[in-house]
Amino acid sequence: MDPNGDYLFRIRTVKAAPIRTLSEALKEILTEANIEIDQNGLKIMAMDGTHTVLVHLRLHADRFDEYKCPQKYILGINMINLFKLVKTMSNNDSLVMFMEKRDTTKMGIVILNGEKQMETTFNLNLIELDINPIEIPPVQFSAIITMPSLDFQKIIRDMGTLGETVEITSASNQLILKCRGDFAEQETVFSVGQGMTVSKSHSEIVQGNFLLKHLVLFTKCTSLCSDISIYLKNDYPIIIEYSVAGLGEIKLALAPAPSKQSHGGK
């Protein structure tokens, strides 16, 4: 492609693999979404079909290898179709996203492999999505836990085979996860140290029950970063934050499970 062509926007990054991972995770949560792109970066703010999960993605313009977007555009994207195009990207590939002035109904995607001197271009059809903007008021969380992303992934996936919900508690300097299934119960306690830190605004115990099937999907983001942040507040959605390989961050919010499912039985 011609880097000096007539584009409305053109973005390039050598971090193709994290974008592939991000696309794979998002397609499990959002079938369709509007991507807002402007001079500051890319943003997705959307809820899943059950109105249980909120996705807030922000990739910053100054973290890309090339970023040219003088004004704001809203791109309606089918996330499943997007992943079909980028799933073949390797760790050594570069990714370019663009829109040409002559055709604003498509987003261009170029996958570049310098080793093989190979360039593949796709043109993804955009869709019209009638989605109302989502505004999130500022919130002070009672506890913020930082821990290794692999540890969180393992415990959530293990519990996902046992029950339907997990009880997550932040008490003192511990993070406690409990799950109850038809054939067994599990409790795992993480204490401060070994990569885990806890920041609390006050000393109250913070506790909530959450559907494991959604948290399991969140863990598809695990390879994006070595550590995650967990934001907790009583009677409020849990938020799991992943860094997107230095490009930005994604926050995944999950509403508490309905009370009838709060004991985790299948």
Predicted regions and their residues:
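DNA polymerase sliding clamps and clamp-related checkpoint/processivity subunits
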Residues: 1-27, 32-161, 169-266
